[in-house]
Design a protein with these regions (language model features):
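Nucleic-acid nuclease catalytic cores
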Residues: 71-97
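Sequence/structural signature of beta-propeller domains
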Residues: 57-58, 92-103
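Acidic-basic catalytic patches of nuclease active cores, encompassing PD-(D/E)XK
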Residues: 1-27, 135-136
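Beta-rich catalytic cores
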Residues: 32
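Charged phosphate-binding loop/patch that engages nucleotide di/tri-phosphates or the phosphate backbone
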Residues: 108-136
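Conserved catalytic cores of phosphodiester-cleaving nucleases, focusing on short active-site segments
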Residues: 36-38, 42-53
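Active-site-adjacent loop/helix micro-motif of nuclease/hydrolase catalytic cores
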Residues: 53-64
Length: 136
């Protein structure tokens, strides 16, 4: 049976533009490296996939450290969070990892979400545009 993150990955793949180079990282070492590496239109970035049943987002300390250090070094990364009920998608910049882990979706961190909604295609388009603008 597929995990919720695997299902989110399968949905995400169908919404990526043609020609996207995509790599799903199956990392069991706990180093904090995000789940997915994407390269679209000469822009490379990382995406950590998270699924939650409520407002709490479970993020390991190694994931927080990796994303915050990567962001501080000028790297581009995101957290794509899928909440089951009520259903909604949230996109956070990787540099917001600590705040997301601490505050979750419902304790003020929502204001820090770069994007929120229920349409994955729109989320993907926003994520690519945001990554491209940072890469310039």
């Amino acid at each position: 049976m597929a995990t919720p993150e695997k299902n989110l990955w399968n949905r995400l793949k169908t919404k990526l533009p043609k020609g996207t180079h995509k790599t799903r990282v199956e990392n069991r070492a706990g180093t904090g490296v995000p789940d997915v590496h994407l390269c679209v239109a000469k822009t490379a970035f990382w995406v950590e996939l998270k699924c939650t049943k409520g407002d709490t987002v479970s993020i390991r300390p190694s994931q927080i450290a990796w994303n915050m250090q990567y962001s501080a070094a000028g790297g581009i990364s995101f957290f794509l969070v899928s909440r089951v009920k009520p259903p909604c998608l949230f996109l956070f910049d990787g540099g917001e990892a600590l705040r997301l882990a601490t505050d979750g979706l419902g304790s003020g961190s929502l204001a820090a979400a770069a994007w929120a909604g229920d349409d994955l295609a729109t989320c993907v388009s926003f994520m690519i545009d945001r990554a491209s603008s940072w890469a310039r």
